[in-house]
């Protein structure tokens, strides 16, 4: 009996010790995570010195930060969310002027999950909703005075839950919910059938090209088709209006089939923007938004679709490199989005390059046909009035290399409106270009503006354009930018397609009469009054005009990314030919399914290559931890220019440990007591900040209408205002730095993070990101533009090799960032997870050269959140210009050990340089505003850290005690059993 009792105690202690160890591990893990997110935890708890107490009130609209001023601000913020939708919603289709609705058309029925459960934003890092204030389409309709069919709403509420909405499932309700009793209600609410169509994807997950039903995710799914068929068959609705709640350009070739009357693209409206879109429906607001992407009849018709997603390396007998399994190759070159559709259209009209062949067709019935391939062009949008455009004058200032187009817009309708002036250009496509693989888009955006034009009135506006935008990058011949000889055409129009038709009419005259068509296939004549011509002064190709950087004349612009081209690495039998308009049929991309990892490629994929330079300085060559006669604090550096020698004295006060504090991001940067620098919080994201306000009701920060909407406003003022409102949000949340905006190019309509980027066009993103960043700086917020660059898909994003040619890199993908980083006010840039070619972006010396040398960029550089992933190398990243490690406090420790163990002065110099950038940037934010001199940094750890450490000790001690008790009882059991056996043996 005693033995059984003892064994029972042992088993109990075994269970208790196991539970205690598990709990201790959970507590330790929680502590680790909390410390990694220190900035966010401090921010949430309002810890003094963690970004919650420094001033910056001079940046606020009211000149103060208080509960009272917050109440005024938050009202203005939500009003601006609605304004984003008012100016960014795009009227794509309006048969027989179905919109705006009359005041008598107020009895309506809503259809589609998106009407009651829309996609407000992606689920990437960013703002959370404030449920009491968010607005669905139904909410916005009811607020606007519409009588919404309650029977249908009740049917949705009681219906079986639909399939989860995901990147591979639309998640629409089963149309079986429309029973006879439900459809009987249609007659009383038959003024309008509103159908909301939604698509969802997010960080880490691209939209599936083929969904769970085996269909393209951007075509109508069966349940959606059933909804439209139900509406059509009922015969009860006077109008059918579609609200397109998708940032992904959906296939829209079915409108006639279902008798749709109007389509309003509302994108992802954020949590509070939908009322603005409904004001467009009612006519309270005249629509003025224009598309930022091409809406194709078949969403896989772009040449990029042939090489999107994951393609596997073939390592053969070699051991695969860490995070080196996959690649993607941009074989389409510069022909992204409208550059493909419009260029192929011109060549089809002019009979060039076999453009009318069937190769690459997805929707055409007999050879490539623009009207069958495209539903709505890039830059297109309708209004409730009509505008006529004339390009009155084109001036060129050679001193500033700037073109100025003077454009008159006449409102010939009976409604006041906002007219978007889109200026496009066409460069000559020459024999030199063909011989040197220089590609030319038939039309490219150059600039834009937006103006109010009263009914019956005319307004004149000027649009300035850098002459540099007309240059083309020649990676083969000149190895730099070139300006071809010949005529350059400038044109305005309602989108790229209309502008191109205007150019063709001016350039070709009678030769194209009867051949030009709009997206519906209607013959058009083109407007030659909307075109101006400039003849380049050079009689042969000019390879010198843009030889040196326009931002830093001491730096020559030449090939930097030869090794980003797949042909640099591929075996001869796997080399590719980039798409060329000289031969559409033979160069149209095919899928590069695999790539053999030869020795050259295998060595290139190895990221762990850092070796201390033979001539590296010694750590002893540097003065660290110097005690100056008069201490220089953080606040003493306010207003000190970046190149002022005072920075040397300031930085010399810091020890190596002090220097490394700034370089480890824990959703913020810790305080540095040595110079009395406070800690700060850093937050995501492009759709709104994942933080809470520190004033008023302490609600979540604002979830704005997302960046495709901001782009679709085509309004510099609204885009700047977006940055300012975002920055004001940050002031009331005590946040000086944010990871926003996003500026990657929408190479494919299936890109998972479309909601965080502006456009398929690098020039539109150039201007929009520049304006947003400027607005943020106006409010003391450092925007961190991301993800630099070639980060156009989520599949395999950590470690994927992204291959592209240098012309596409410079004219498309880097240009989207150039406005904010080289021209604008951004002092932050985040590199991408992917490799540029085979080199991880944050360790790519070419990126540092572009940013620091060519663009003369003076801000900080941060990697994306790798957290010690194997394919990255901390010293390689540091030497390539990375200044701070995102969500990673381990890397600075690694750097410290490497510097001290190897006496590596080169690494130390990079650490000092990084701190120079980081301190300078922080001082340009609200951290360097009023009240900075009053901050006192304490050695004391925040109370929550002390508490967690105490809990760690307690639970670890309990776990150890439980294990000890288990061991003791187990030993006692064994000892007792031995004694029992000995007694039994003696009896025998």
Please place each PLM-identified region on the residue numbering.
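Terminal connector regions
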Residues: 467-542
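Glycoside hydrolase catalytic-domain context in secreted enzymes
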Residues: 1-474, 482-492, 496, 545-988
């Amino acid at each position: 009996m005693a033995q059984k009792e003892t064994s029972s105690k042992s088993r109990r202690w075994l269970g208790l010790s196991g539970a205690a160890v598990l709990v201790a591990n959970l507590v330790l893990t929680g502590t680790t995570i909390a410390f990694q997110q220190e900035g966010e935890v401090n921010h949430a708890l309002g810890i003094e010195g963690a970004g919650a107490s420094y001033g910056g009130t001079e940046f606020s609209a009211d000149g103060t930060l208080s509960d009272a001023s917050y109440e005024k601000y938050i009202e203005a913020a939500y009003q601006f969310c609605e304004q984003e939708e008012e100016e960014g919603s795009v009227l794509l289709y309006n048969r027989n002027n179905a919109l705006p609705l009359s005041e008598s058309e107020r009895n309506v029925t809503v259809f589609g999950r998106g009407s009651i459960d829309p996609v407000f934003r992606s689920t990437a890092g960013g703002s959370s909703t404030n449920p009491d204030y968010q607005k669905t389409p139904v909410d916005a309709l009811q607020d606007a005075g519409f009588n919404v069919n309650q029977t249908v709403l009740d049917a949705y509420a009681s219906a079986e839950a639909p399939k989860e909405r995901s990147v591979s499932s639309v998640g629409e309700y089963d149309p079986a919910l429309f029973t006879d009793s439900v459809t009987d209600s249609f007659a009383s609410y038959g003024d309008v059938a509103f159908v909301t169509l939604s698509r969802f994807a997010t960080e880490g997950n691209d939209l599936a090209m083929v969904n769970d039903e085996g269909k393209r995710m951007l075509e109508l799914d069966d349940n959606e088709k059933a909804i439209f068929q139900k509406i059509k068959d009922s015969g009860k609705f006077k109008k059918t209006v579609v609200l397109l709640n998708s940032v992904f350009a959906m296939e829209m070739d079915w409108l006639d089939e279902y008798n749709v009357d109007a389509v309003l693209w509302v994108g992802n409206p954020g949590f509070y923007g939908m009322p603005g879109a409904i004001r467009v429906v009612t006519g309270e607001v005249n629509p003025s938004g224009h598309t930022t992407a091409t809406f194709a009849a078949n969403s896989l018709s772009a040449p990029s679709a042939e090489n999107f997603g994951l393609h596997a390396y073939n390592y053969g007998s070699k051991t695969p490199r860490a995070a080196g399994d996959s690649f993607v190759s941009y074989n389409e070159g510069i022909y992204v989005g409208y550059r493909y559709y419009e260029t192929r259209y011109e060549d089809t009209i002019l009979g060039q390059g076999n453009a009318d062949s069937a190769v690459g067709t997805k929707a055409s019935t007999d050879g490539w046909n623009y009207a069958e391939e495209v539903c709505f062009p890039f830059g297109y949008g309708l209004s409730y009035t009509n505008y006529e455009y004339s390009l009155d004058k084109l001036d060129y200032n050679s001193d500033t290399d700037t073109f100025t187009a003077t454009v008159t817009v006449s409102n010939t309708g009976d409604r006041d409106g906002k007219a978007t002036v889109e200026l496009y250009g066409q460069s000559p496509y020459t024999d030199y270009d063909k011989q040197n693989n220089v590609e030319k888009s038939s039309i490219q955006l150059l600039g834009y503006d937006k103006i109010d034009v009263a009914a019956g009135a005319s307004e004149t506006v000027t649009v300035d354009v850098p002459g540099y935008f007309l240059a083309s990058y020649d990676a083969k011949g000149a190895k730099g930018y070139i300006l071809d000889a010949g005529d350059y055409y400038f044109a305005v129009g309602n989108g790229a397609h209309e502008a191109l038709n205007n150019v063709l009419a001016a350039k070709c005259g009678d030769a194209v009469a009867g051949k030009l068509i709009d997206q519906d296939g209607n013959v058009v004549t083109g407007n030659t009054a909307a075109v101006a011509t400039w003849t380049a002064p050079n009689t042969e190709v000019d390879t010198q005009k843009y030889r040196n950087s326009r931002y830093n004349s001491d730096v020559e612009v030449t090939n930097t990314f030869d090794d980003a081209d797949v042909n640099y690495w591929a075996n001869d039998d796997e080399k590719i030919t980039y798409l060329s308009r000289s031969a559409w049929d033979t160069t149209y991309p095919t899928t590069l399914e695999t790539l053999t990892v030869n020795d050259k490629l295998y060595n290139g994929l190895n990221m762990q290559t850092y070796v201390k330079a033979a001539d590296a300085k010694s750590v002893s060559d540097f003065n660290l931890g110097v005690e100056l006669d008069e201490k220089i604090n953080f606040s003493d550096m306010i207003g000190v220019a970046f190149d002022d020698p005072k920075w040397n004295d300031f930085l010399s006060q810091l020890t190596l440990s002090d220097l490394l504090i700034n370089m480890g991001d824990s959703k913020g940067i810790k305080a540095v007591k040595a110079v009395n620098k406070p800690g700060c919080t850093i937050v995501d994201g492009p759709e709104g900040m994942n933080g809470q306000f520190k004033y008023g009701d302490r609600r979540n920060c604002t979830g704005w209408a997302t960046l495709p909407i901001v782009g679709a406003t085509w309004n510099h003022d609204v885009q700047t205002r977006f940055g300012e409102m975002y920055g004001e949000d940050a002031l009331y949340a005590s946040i000086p730095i944010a990871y926003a905006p996003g500026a990657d190019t929408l190479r494919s309509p299936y890109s998972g993070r479309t909601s965080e980027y502006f456009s398929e066009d690098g020039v539109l993103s150039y201007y929009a990101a520049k304006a947003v960043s400027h607005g943020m700086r106006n409010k003391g917020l450092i925007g961190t533009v991301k993800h630099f660059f070639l980060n156009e898909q989520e599949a395999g994003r950590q470690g994927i090799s992204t291959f592209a040619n240098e012309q596409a890199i410079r004219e498309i993908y880097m240009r989207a960032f150039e406005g904010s980083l080289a021209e604008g006010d951004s002092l932050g840039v985040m590199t991408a997870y992917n490799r540029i070619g085979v080199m991880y972006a944050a360790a790519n010396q070419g990126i540092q050269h572009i940013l620091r040398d060519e663009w003369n960029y003076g801000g900080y550089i941060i990697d994306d959140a790798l957290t010690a992933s194997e394919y990255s190398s901390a010293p390689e990243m540091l030497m390539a210009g990375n200044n701070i490690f995102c969500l990673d406090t381990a890397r600075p420790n690694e750097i410290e050990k490497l510097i001290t163990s190897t006496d590596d002065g080169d690494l130390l110099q990079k650490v000092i340089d990084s701190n120079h950038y980081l301190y300078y940037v922080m001082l340009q934010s609200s951290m360097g505003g009023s009240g900075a001199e009053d901050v006192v940094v304490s050695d004391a750890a925040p109370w929550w850290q002390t508490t967690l450490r105490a809990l760690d000790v307690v639970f670890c001690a309990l776990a150890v005690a439980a294990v000890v008790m288990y061991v003791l009882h187990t030993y006692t059991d064994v000892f007792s059993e031995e004694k029992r056996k000995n007694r039994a043996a003696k009896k025998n």
